[in-house]
């Protein structure tokens, strides 16, 4: 990169919400997988209505994209089962909390 190159990006607030369809598109997963992630406690819809029948209206915080990508990586690339991925994400959350202290 030279001194005249310009970087462009979009600032996304932590409070930004995305639809379940947007989450699926960003993470290349199906809605059925998102439902399973919600049932396993990996994801929480922002409105706390975590019934699968309402999945089409679910919204998630933008940070859920990274969370799903990590879960997918753990499962597909590292062979971790769903319960193991949920546990790993929970431990990663706890570590992040401790680092913020």
Model-predicted regions and their roles:
Residues 2-25, 31-35, 39-101:
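Arg/Lys-rich, alpha-helical DNA-contact motif
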């Amino acid at each position: 990169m030279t001194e005249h190159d310009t970087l462009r990006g979009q600032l996304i607030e932590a409070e930004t919400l995305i639809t379940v369809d947007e989450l699926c598109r960003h993470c290349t997963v199906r809605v059925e997988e998102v439902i399973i992630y919600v049932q396993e406690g990996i994801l929480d819809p922002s409105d706390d209505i975590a019934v699968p029948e309402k999945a089409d209206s679910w919204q998630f915080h933008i940070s859920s994209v990274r969370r799903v990508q990590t879960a997918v990586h753990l499962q597909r690339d590292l062979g971790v089962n769903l319960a193991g991925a949920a546990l790993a994400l929970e431990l990663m959350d706890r570590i992040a909390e401790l680092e913020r202290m």
